[in-house]
A protein has these predicted regions:
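Conserved catalytic palm subdomain of right-hand nucleotidyl-transferase polymerases, strongest
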Residues: 71-85, 97, 101-122
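Conserved P-loop/Walker A NTP-binding site and adjacent catalytic elements of P-loop NTPases
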Residues: 133
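Reverse-transcribing Pol proteins
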Residues: 1-93, 138
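A general structural signal for short secondary-structure junctions and capping/turn motifs
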Residues: 5-8, 67-69, 101-105, 113, ...
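Cytochrome P450 core scaffold surrounding the K-helix E-X-X-R motif
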Residues: 85-92, 120-130
């Protein structure tokens, strides 16, 4: 059931829409403590191997990235996309009230909760959006 490979959403690729007249943002890389350099290198290699990351030579866009060690010995790979987020067109989406959701569940016998490991990595971006999500490492 769980073979360690990354599943992919089979629907359409996601397109990030930017506001009009924005300029690209290219950050400087965050410094990485020497003690974490090898761990970061291994994590990048792993993400390249499973198809999450792809090496490129240059880009107008770049978000700084770092890792946070977890208690279990693995790391959390974090990219700071706050500057990109400021440039994205917002698509209003009404969040339903909990009370309304509970009313819809009345009479159901089962409830399921799903948690996607590495959730955002399951959704492919269209080629133009991939360029926006470029990361920079030291």
């Amino acid at each position: 059931m769980f073979d360690g490979t990354l599943g992919t959403y089979k629907g359409s690729e996601y397109k990030i829409e930017l506001k009009e007249g924005i300029k690209p943002y290219h950050a400087k890389p965050f410094p990485i403590p020497r003690i974490h350099e090898e761990t970061l290198k291994k994590e990048v290699e792993r993400l390249v191997k499973i198809g999450v990351l792809k090496r490129i030579n240059n880009s107008e866009w770049a978000a700084p990235t770092f890792i946070i060690p977890k208690k279990n010995g693995t790391v959390r790979f974090i990219s700071d996309f706050r500057e990109l987020n400021k440039r994205i067109k917002r698509k209003p989406f009404p969040i339903p009230k909990i009370q309304d959701l509970l009313l819809k569940l009345e009479g159901f016998k089962y409830a399921t909760s799903l948690d996607l490991n590495m959730g955002y990595y399951h959704i492919k971006l269209c080629p133009k959006s991939r360029k926006l999500c470029t990361i920079v490492l030291p």
